[in-house]
Every structure is written in C-alpha cells, then in structure tokens.
From Swiss-Prot:
This is ATP synthase subunit a, chloroplastic. F-type ATPases have 2 components, CF(1) - the catalytic core - and CF(0) - the membrane proton channel. CF(1) has five subunits: alpha(3), beta(3), gamma(1), delta(1), epsilon(1). CF(0) has four main subunits: a, b, b' and c. Keywords: ATP synthesis, CF(0), Chloroplast, Hydrogen ion transport, Ion transport, Membrane, Plastid, Thylakoid, Transmembrane, Transmembrane helix, Transport. The lineage of its organism: Eukaryota, Viridiplantae, Streptophyta, Embryophyta, Tracheophyta. GO terms for molecular function: proton-transporting ATP synthase activity, rotational mechanism. It comes from Coffea arabica.
Length: 244
C-alpha cells in the first residue's frame, strides 16, 4: 500500500508541474524570454571562463586544461574538414561554437541544479530544452550555408534549384525549409524527452534508480551536439560544392 501511495503521490506531483509557463522580461514593446536568456548566459559564461582559465598561460608543450582544449579544437577541425573539404578553415569557429554551446547546454540540464532558482513563472532548464533556442541555432545554420554558397558561387548558386531538372524545383526549395526544421526539432525533442523521463523517474522511484538513465542522457546529449554540428558542416560543404 505504501508503494502504491508513493506512486500516486509522484504522479500527482508530476501532474502539478506547469507546462508552457514562461518568465518574460518586458523591454519596450517587446516580451523577452528571460528563462532562455538566463540559462544561455550561464552556458556562455562557463565556456568563456573555462577557456580563459585553461589558456591564460599557454605552454609550448600543452598540459592540463590547455591540452584538453587543443584536443577539442583538433576534433572540431577534423569534423569540419571531413564535411566541408579543404576550405574548412574559416568555418571552424562557427562549427566549434555550435558544438560547444549545444554540448554544454545539454549537459547543463542534467548537471546544474536549475530547480533551486525560483522564478515568478515557469522554471529554469537547459537552453536547448526550449524550442526558441533550437530554432535560432537552426536558422543560423541556414544563414551560414546560404552565405557559404553565395560567397563561393555568386548568384549561380541558386541554379542548384533546377538541377538535375527544373521539374524538381519545388522539391529543392522545400528541402531548404526542411533542413532547419529537422535540425531544430530533433535537438529539442531529444533533450526535452530526456529531461521529462528523468523528472518522472525521480518523482516515482528512489534517487538511485534514475541514475543510469541520467548517465544515458549525458551520452545522448553529447551525441546530439555532435549530430547537429556535423549536419551543419555537411550543409555548408554541400552548398559550396553543389552536390547532394
């Protein structure tokens, strides 16, 4: 009976969570999504702070934090070169920023105690747990690959829409709309589902049981960051080379 009572209580607690509640800032005539900005600033501060500490005294033979960040940079370079080709150099900062921001954002949802910070409405969570963030990242990626294609080929870039035959014009146009949609909803859906599963399990069972799920969530969060960055690089490479 106690188990049943605890289970029902957990379900009641979960049902009481506010869904769709947000904390807004009123700036002029606009409503600004305060939750996403706060958590995004925290993630940016973590990235900038850790990088500044790691490379504040660079050594010829790297050690410690400098060695770790150089390894991360090499990894991002490899991903960029594989997907973009020999002209990958200028795009390493963009791909690296996407990967690191998404990676730290995803992990912050599991590792940082956002819940202890009380807001008038809603609650804090990972930035990528909000569709506004993932859509913004996907739109930035779209702008990037259009810019890459137009910079490389000029207006002839738009000739891709009638290749290999003009009959495919509607499909080729639709493809450019589905790319940001798939990027944003894939990332948002995976992170949201992971956090919801952990919340439900923590409410229903003892703390030790959800721990394996939390570790699995950390793994999948890293994979999602890699997938997003890899696809962004692939789209940029595709726009520059003109192949599908």
């Amino acid at each position: 009976m106690n188990v049943l009572a605890n289970t029902l209580k957990g379900l009641y607690d979960v049902s009481g969570v506010e869904v769709g509640q947000h904390f807004y800032w009123q700036i002029g005539g606009f409503q600004v999504h305060g939750q996403v900005l706060i958590t995004s600033w925290v993630v940016i501060a973590i990235l900038l702070g850790s990088a500044a500490i790691a490379v504040r005294d660079p050594q010829t033979i790297p050690t410690g934090g400098q060695n770790f960040f150089e390894y991360v940079l090499e990894f991002i370079r490899d991903v960029s070169k594989t997907q973009i080709g020999e002209e990958y150099g200028p795009w390493v900062p963009f791909i690296g920023t996407l990967f690191l921001f998404i990676f730290v954002s995803n992990w912050s949802g599991a590792l940082l105690p956002w819940k202890i910070i009380q807001l008038p409405h809603g609650e804090l969570a990972a930035p990528t747990n909000d569709i506004n963030t993932t859509v913004a990242l996907a739109l930035l990626t779209s702008v990037a690959y259009f810019y890459a294609g137009i910079t490389k080929k000029g207006l002839s870039y738009f000739g891709k829409y009638i290749q290999p035959t003009p009959i495919l014009l509607p499909i080729n146009i639709l493809e450019d709309f589905t790319k940001p949609l798939s990027l944003s909803f894939r990332l948002f859906g995976n992170i949201l589902a992971d956090e919801l599963v952990v919340v439900v399990l923590v409410s229903l069972v003892p703390l030790v049981v959800p721990i394996p799920v939390m570790f699995l969530g950390l793994f999948t969060s890293g994979i999602q960051a890699l997938i997003f960055a890899t696809l962004a690089a692939a789209y940029i490479g595709e726009s520059m080379e003109g192949h599908h």
